Amino acid sequence: MKLNKELIIVIDRLRNRKRLWNLPKTLSLASNNPESLSELDDYLTICKLASQDDKFFKKFRSCSSYRAILENVDGKSGLELVNAFERLGKDVSEFRHLWHGEIGAPYKYHVKRAGYVSPTELRYSKIILELETIFGSLNSYSISEIGVGFGGQGGQILASSNVKSYEFIDLVEPLGLVKRYLKEIQQLDKAVFTTPNNLQKGRRDLVISNYAFSELNRELQESYFEKVISQSTRGFIIYNHITPPKYKTMTATEFASRIPTSEIFSETPLSYPGNVLVTWGHTGSLGDE
C-alpha cells in the first residue's frame, strides 16, 4: 500500500522522536569561558564520549545537545537541498555512495528523489558539488577545514576526491570523534588533525568552514586568519551572524573586505536569515552575488 505524504511525515517524526535522547547532566563538560558557540553546551562532552565509547558512538548524532550544534537539517530543508543539486545540473543519486546515515543514528526523513536519508549528508554532498562548480576538481589539493563536526564533510571529500591532504582543525574532543568516524568509513590515510594551539602558518590550496569560523570570538578568528585564511589560495566559508555581542565576531562583510579577491554569495538553500557564502580564488560561479 502506498502511503500518502502526510502519513510519511508523521512516521518520520515519530521515528526521529524515538531516536532523540538527552545527555545526563552528571556527564557535562560545558565550558565556563567559551571561545565558540560549540563550547556553550554539552557538544564537547558528547564528542568525547562518542569517540571513546561504542554505546555513545552508535547514537551520538541523535543526542539533543549534539543536534543543537550540528544535526539540525530537517526534511523540508532536505528537499530544498535536492533542488539545489538540480539547479547545478546534477542528480542527487550520484552522491548516494558518499552517505553514511547508518553511523551515529541521525534523524532521517523520506526526501523526494533522495530516499530515506539524513539531510545532513545531503548538505555535505551539496557543498562538494558547489566546491567543484567554482573550483573544479579537488584532486591534489591540500585542504584545511575549520570546525569539523564529526568529520562528515571531510569524509565525503576524502571519499570523492584524490586530495593531497585534508587537515581537520578543531578542539581535542571533536578531533577524537573525527578520527573514530574516519576509521569507521576507512578514510584516515590522508587526514591530518590540528588543534588551535598547534596550528602552523603555511600555504593551503583551499580552506573551508561550514559556519564554524563565523561562530568564533574575534581573538580566535584573528589567529585563524593569520595562520590559515590569509595563507589559502582558495576559500569557501559559509557564514552566519549568531554569536553574542561579547564575542565581537567579524561580520561576513568585514571578513570578505580583508580578502581582496573574495566575493559574497547567497547561501542556497538559506538555512538561517542572514547566512552567506564567502569565496575567493574561484573561477566558476554559483549564481547571484
Can you name each region flagged by the protein language model?
Residues 2-118:
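N-terminal accessory regions of S-adenosyl-L-methionine
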Residues 121-139:
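Conserved alpha-helix/loop element of class I SAM-dependent methyltransferases that forms part
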Residues 139-149:
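Conserved class I S-adenosyl-L-methionine
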Residues 150-162:
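Conserved SAM-binding loop of SAM-dependent methyltransferases across substrates and taxa
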Residues 180-202:
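S-adenosyl-L-methionine
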Residues 205-219:
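A short SAM/SAH-binding and catalytic strip from SAM-dependent methyltransferases
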Residues 216-228:
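A short, conserved alpha-helix within the catalytic core of class I
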Residues 232-243:
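Conserved beta-strand signature within the Rossmann-like core of class I S-adenosyl-L-methionine
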